[in-house]
Swiss-Prot record:
Binding site for ATP: 15-22
Biological function: Component of the cytosolic iron-sulfur (Fe/S) protein assembly (CIA) machinery. Required for maturation of extramitochondrial Fe-S proteins. The nbp35-cfd1 heterotetramer forms a Fe-S scaffold complex, mediating the de novo assembly of an Fe-S cluster and its transfer to target apoproteins.
Name the record gives this protein: Cytosolic Fe-S cluster assembly factor cfd1
Entry keyword annotation includes Iron-sulfur: yes
Xref: Gene3D superfamilies: P-loop containing nucleotide triphosphate hydrolases
Annotated binding of [4Fe-4S] cluster, by residue: 210, 213
Biased composition (Basic and acidic residues): 269-282
Amino acid sequence: MPLDGVKNIVLVLSGKGGVGKSSVTLQLALALTLQGKSVGILDIDLTGPSIPRLVGLEDAKITQAPGGWVPVTVHPASTNDGAQRGSLRCMSLGFLLRDRGDAVIWRGPKKTAMIRQFLSDVYWGETDYLLVDTPPGTSDEHIALAEQLLRPATTNPAAGSSTMPRLAGAVLVTTPQAVATSDVRKEVNFCVKTQIPMLGVIENMSGYTCPCCGEVTNLFSSGGGQVMAQETGVKFLGAVPVDIQFGELVEGKVVDESDDESEDGAQPEQKREQKQDEVVDERPLVERYKDCWSYSRFEGFADTLLSEIEGGVAY
């Protein structure tokens, strides 16, 4: 089966949209690869896939192999200066769309069938961690995912081993404000009812750090995620302020050609010349990510998750 080589599956959940699940998924994946782990990202947000854009591979296409669909490689495994870096690959419906602007207008049964196909027809090979980026709420995608991953593991008589990977648990993502935490509480309830272990809560967008003076401004208040975690008995992994550098990294500083003139009166030709003069950083995404200050936060999250998962601790 395509999931045979996957050792652990981690779900990234939130009851609220727009809290940054996809960016958290990507940063956790990058941090884990820098720990030497081979990582895959499965994007099951079928109507709004974000992973292809975040990894800068919107034009990549899925190839078919005898073992199933082959995920898109973000970067291969390598060893630099004695440090082992694991591989990162991803799979998303965004890679299968004929045009990236096409809307996905599917009813529940078709979504369920697509989730099942992702879990049965994608060949991941040897993968330490498969992170699943989910849509907000507790809808068809979540139910289909839980049904597939929570089935009793079957045993292959020839190999004498389980053919299903371990569902290590879920990471819950929220922003500090009450309108977000109230919906994430419902996600906690979903995990309890489906018996999905909860690895912890990450409070995303917890303030904004000025790049000039370092002053932190609480744009969306602060501490709401920690309070929710304490009240629901789930481990609080930590808070992450807004990181402008990471935003620029995944956006690629795209020039908006629709702007005829900038505020200072520069013409489009001048802006294109300025763009051509910029030095293009050809390093892989994972190496450029190490320059973002949020990397240290997610490195800590990755350490905590590795100790919980490989040490057998979950809530």
